[in-house]
UniProtKB/Swiss-Prot annotation:
Transmembrane residue ranges: 487-503
Lineage, uppermost ranks: Eukaryota, Metazoa, Chordata, Craniata, Vertebrata
Descriptive protein name: UDP-glucuronosyltransferase 1A6
Keywords, comma-separated and alphabetical: Endoplasmic reticulum, Glycoprotein, Glycosyltransferase, Membrane, Microsome, Phosphoprotein, Signal, Transferase, Transmembrane, Transmembrane helix
Keyword Glycoprotein: yes
Described function: UDP-glucuronosyltransferase (UGT) that catalyzes phase II biotransformation reactions in which lipophilic substrates are conjugated with glucuronic acid to facilitate their inactivation and excretion from the body. Essential for the elimination and detoxification of drugs, xenobiotics and endogenous compounds. Involved in the glucuronidation of arachidonic acid (AA) and AA-derived eicosanoids including 15-HETE and 20-HETE. Conjugates small planar phenolic molecules such as 4-nitrophenol, 1-naphthol, and 4-methylumbelliferone.
Any GO MF annotation of the entry: enzyme binding
Amino acid sequence: MACLLPAARLPAGFLFLVLWGSVLGDKLLVVPQDGSHWLSMKEIVEHLSERGHDIVVLVPEVNLLLGESKYYRRKSFPVPYNLEELRTRYRSFGNNHFAASSPLMAPLREYRNNMIVIDMCFFSCQSLLKDSATLSFLRENQFDALFTDPAMPCGVILAEYLKLPSIYLFRGFPCSLEHIGQSPSPVSYVPRFYTKFSDHMTFPQRLANFIANILENYLYHCLYSKYEILASDLLKRDVSLPALHQNSLWLLRYDFVFEYPRPVMPNMIFIGGTNCKKKGNLSQEFEAYVNASGEHGIVVFSLGSMVSEIPEKKAMEIAEALGRIPQTLLWRYTGTRPSNLAKNTILVKWLPQNDLLGHPKARAFITHSGSHGIYEGICNGVPMVMMPLFGDQMDNAKRMETRGAGVTLNVLEMTADDLENALKTVINNKSYKENIMRLSSLHKDRPIEPLDLAVFWVEYVMRHKGAPHLRPAAHDLTWYQYHSLDVIGFLLAIVLTVVFIVYKSCAYGCRKCFGGKGRVKKSHKSKTH
């Protein structure tokens, strides 16, 4: 009995992993997406490395966040751009979201802006798949599995080329999940990307959702048709990307305290909140800021790594609003310092966001509604003022607003008064704090931490060389078989045939029964005349 007591004190996640066991020392190839997408993947990669796995991260030689690390080996490949060009493109991508446009032109502007980054990713992928030295290195290393972000499908193509079981880390997609994961997605209650609808839609919203679902197929083709050409050249056969997306496992950064409930497949594992690391001690600098805030506490403000500066007029409006509240504002901002910045607002180029949100003095979180920030807000129970800018951020903000955990502002149209009122609302109205604390409690009430769960399933795929028993047979069906159109057509043909036979039989019977009598009567009349 005494032997069991120390084990009982171990973290549940650690015990779970130890009990299941793992063949340590497997070789994992990681094909990440640069930028904020890398942050969640990095946490998983580091934990896998700590468990003894040999990890190689494939990176373009010019990148933003894919730096050296003691946890993995980097294998770089050449790309046709330099660091200044890369930074300029990302800076342009972030800053363009503050440009006003008409509602009719907004979708086109969003598409063109997204293509700034998507084209850069394509150039990177093209260089990789045409670099014979890198491909030779990958073939020779005999990896056990491939771990990738499928938003840009270079890793998907490599998994097919190297014949490796693959694991996808995924949060959102310009096209809905069913297009690549074969997961059912009823348009009646599963809102499509960019619609900003909830799961309770009015008839006009369901109509718009239905149309958006149709347009997603066209969008998918526009975004990824070039990758199909790359894949066909590399694999020496005609391929389609949906056919290549037959991975072993999806690690979805989902948690249904945040997402709307929807159907899923057995090879989909939910790991929302992996980026909510254990809160560490604040540095002396930030500890001093927090302590100086007094009873009013702090507000954390960050619009993410993609936004480096804000137009001067808008920045001054924001600064004016922040100066009207009693809290201390910690604003992550690398642009020009607003001339009207108040004494209660501190500009920093970087801040320990999760650690600050986890401090008892955190009163509110001003965020662009990126999924990483949303989950950190949920984990730490901090109500939010949301200023979504692009991508899935509008939908994320709608989800939190629907749950009563935050207020959404249109960053292009809001005034200083709007921001001031929103901050005072989420800070002073207790319902927002109560709602976010309830979400936090639900999120944390689980048998294993999402990071431990992600590590387990990556090891599971490496240990068993894939997970084909979890793969839905829907991947093997044509579109008309998936929707049973051939069965419906066959049954319809039978019904129509039966109806036709019955109709003809009745017509023939009527002619026999009534047609003969008519002729007899007619013949009788002619004889009497």
